[in-house]
Amino acid sequence: MPDFSYGATTDRAAGAQRLVTKRPDLTMLSRTADSLYWVSRYVERAEYLARILDATTRLTNLPHAYGGAGTEWHSAVLTAGCEEAFAKAYGEANERNVCDFLTFNPDNPSSIRNCLALARANARAVRTALTSEMWDALNSAWLELQRFEKKRMDREEFARFLDWVKNVSLVFDGSAYRTMLRDDGYWFSRLGVYIERADNTARILDVKYHVLLPDTEQVGGSLDYFQWTTVLREVSALTAYHWVYREAVKPVLIADLLILNRRMPRSLAACYENISRFLDLLGDAYGRQGPAQRQARKTLSSLSNTQIETIFEGGLHEFISDFITENNRLGATIIDQYLQ
């Protein structure tokens, strides 16, 4: 599976270009736009890592009668997109090593600690472009994170920590939605959210592929059901699933909800609907459409014109891997087009 593409920090060259716009009220520096984009991506990524660890913990806490797959912690590393870095640092993928690597390890660029640190660093560099509520959410989170880091956490405290990380993202996202002016700063911030969220939804859906069923367990059995239910729970979609489909948990319907259903906020289709909208707003404001707009429309069109049965026929894992590659490519195109 493709690795995470790491973002900018605050040490960009001082000679940032001013974005050319046909609207006099939009005069943002590319450096400012870049930082706003990456603040949102890093906060969203921290939440995703918390969801991955929460899901993995649930899978490993199955009653003994179910048996375990024994691959859950390795799957967490694979799904986080950092298998090679983890192997160099730890080797064995057990609970202690994976939790340490994905939460507080300062040498992992995409640990929760470093995601929140980089989000705060980028936010501080463009402090005047943020509302006070957004800055307070990040600054308070950073101070609280240091208190968590000093604690000796048992499983109960670790679960509280993961819930706290998810809440940090909700507070920051809500602050941005409620307080930012609807201009190019907001549009770049939302692009960061949805590019990252699309990547994360694809990866957390793929976690089921990497958690293998034991030889004694059948597809459609109790363990398989529990694993798929965990996937739904970790994208806050269990209630939505039953509301939309009104039947027992089925893999094909879960994939339909998380890939193609635009009513589901974390679905790939919903993410790309928003990505296309915000890119079009930027294109209109800056007076030209470019490769980013074309790539986003192509992906949205593909998602709109496919059926979930077609995806399963070609292989769900293969579809997700291709999607992650294309999503990373769009992220790079946005940077080239607007943020360099």
Where on the chain are the PLM-derived regions?
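Alpha-helical transmembrane segments and their helix-helix packing motifs
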Residues: 2-10, 19-340
